[in-house]
């Protein structure tokens, strides 16, 4: 018996995939399984309403927001640092961008030192994308100079990540904590149809939801 089961549902349009999945998910919920779904197309709105779940739709006025940097000391591990590194790289490089080994190591170092500054040295006021961005803008040039690194496009880093910093067009996305009441819900649907064609927001929001 495993608690990490997986399956894949494939079929042409109109073949009943959503109908089947509604049935499967309902049965799982009835067996006391907590359900969190990411959907495009409003396929599970009716089921969510039926079971009294929480249905959250992404809109420009009310984007889905989370603060992936707000973690406890015991939650800081290789997996979490890797997740945050992928998040930063997604904003900086996009889904198709090439990441060099130097850039990968650089961002990993900055993230690690950022948390050290907060947990060990108490030099950072709070954990958020805002404070990470502020810290990285100062620390990255220092690391580049200390190690004589070349080929780091610091201007593009500062420019692209600024969209998610305070005052930017997506300033709420990575800085506002998820409603803690959601942790008490047993059935949650995140509807992100409105950003399914956005090459940055769609993978980014999906990534932070799954975290």
Where do the model's predicted regions map?
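P-loop NTPase motor domains
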Residues: 1, 42-54, 60-211
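Glycine-rich phosphate-binding loop of nucleotide-binding enzymes
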Residues: 1-60
């Amino acid at each position: 018996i495993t608690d990490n089961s997986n399956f894949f549902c494939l079929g042409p349009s109109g073949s009943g995939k959503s109908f089947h999945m509604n049935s499967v998910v309902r049965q799982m919920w009835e067996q006391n399984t907590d359900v969190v779904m990411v959907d495009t197309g409003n396929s599970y709105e009716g089921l969510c309403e039926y079971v009294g779940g929480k249905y959250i739709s992404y809109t420009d006025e009310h984007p889905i927001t989370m603060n992936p940097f707000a973690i406890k000391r015991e939650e800081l591990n290789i997996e979490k640092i890797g997740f945050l590194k992928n998040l930063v790289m997604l904003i900086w490089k996009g889904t198709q961008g090439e990441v060099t080994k130097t850039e990968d190591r650089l961002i990993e170092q900055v993230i690690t030192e950022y948390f050290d500054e907060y947990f060990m040295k108490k030099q950072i006021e709070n954990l958020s994308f805002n404070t990470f961005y502020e810290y990285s803008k100062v620390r990255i040039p220092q690391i580049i100079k200390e190690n004589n690194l070349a080929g780091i496009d610091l201007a593009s880093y500062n420019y692209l990540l600024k969209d998610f910093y305070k005052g930017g067009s997506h300033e709420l996305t990575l800085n506002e904590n998820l409603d803690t009441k959601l942790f008490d819900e047993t059935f949650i649907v995140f509807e992100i149809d409105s950003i399914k064609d956005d090459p940055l927001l769609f993978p980014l929001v999906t990534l932070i939801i799954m975290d």
